[in-house]
Amino acid sequence: MGYQKIKIPADGDKITVNSDLSLNVPNHPIVPYLEGDGIGVDITPVMKKVVNSAIERAYGTKRSISWMEVFAGEKATKVYGPDQWLPEETLNAFREFSVGI
């Protein structure tokens, strides 16, 4: 699926869902994230750093997350235009990549 505003990382793979609803998680999954409004701009970079550090500590270089920003709220209106608080593109990305923050 192509996206107009969302940039898919080149160095990762999708998490997929099996018919029994279990997950196939690759070593380098792409995880969509919303920065959010309010304190999101302050806590999102720290959250990513903490998660990245925990993964590195547990798995070394064998596993990592490729973060993919998707948009909602005020930031979405700046990227997509007025009244685009939750763009369809964001919903599609969460559907396609199965897991997000």
Feature map (PLM): residue ranges:
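Metallocofactor- and cofactor-centric catalytic cores in central/energy metabolism, strongly enriched
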Residues: 1-101
